[in-house]
Amino acid sequence: VASRGLGDVYKRQGNYRLVEHYDSHWNPLPDFNIDKPNDPFKPYGSTPGHWLEWAKLCLQIYGLDSTQTWSLPTAESLFKAADEAWMPGYVYTVDWQGFPVCSYRFWWPITEAIGTAHFLSQITNESQYKEAYEHLWNFADQYFIDHDYGVWFYELDDNLHPVSRTWFGKPDLYHVYQAALYCDVSYKDGFAQGLINKSNF
């Protein structure tokens, strides 16, 4: 499924904005929910956080089977493509020309970016990915992490201030927990196996 949907992303010359919605016959619906651009689960446009998530998953595919040669360049292309959504922090959605539709900054895209940057650094040993990993963590530490009460803020406004427009409270833990674990696991392992392999865990 991943290779069919993503296998030529790095050849598309800019057509990396992934379609989010399809009908029952897998025909793309690029205008789905155009009248509800801020929908928290089915928004109009393309979601850069999902580009980052797919990039991370492609690297895990590469870790399981390095003969899937499409997976590494696809991950690199998607990771770099998400730069267009950094304003700073990743905006929730962009239109098909790359302009922001919903400029909310949610917590989960940066956690996916942290994992992707870490795995790319492991695989390529390129300094740009190590620097990206550190930059993303510094941004998260400054704006998303709630140092008074723990966990993360789940949404920031355009001025990077915490707000509660979409969710109230702190409804999600697994994204931020994963972000904290990436430094201890390899792209070749899932979280459980990776942590088992750590003798100090």
Give the label of every model feature segment.
Residues 1-10:
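Single conserved hydrophobic/aromatic residue that forms the stacking wall/gate
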Residues 9, 15, 21, 153, ...:
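Intrinsically disordered, low-complexity N-terminal regions enriched in serine/proline/glycine
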Residues 11-18, 27, 84-89, 142-150:
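Proline-centered turn/helix-capping motifs that create local helix->coil transitions or kinks
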Residues 3-4, 29-80, 96-142, 158-201:
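Aromatic (Trp/Tyr) and acidic
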Residues 19-20, 72:
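Short beta-strand segments
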Residues 91-94, 146-159:
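A glycine-biased, small/acidic residue-tolerant capping/turn segment at secondary-structure junctions
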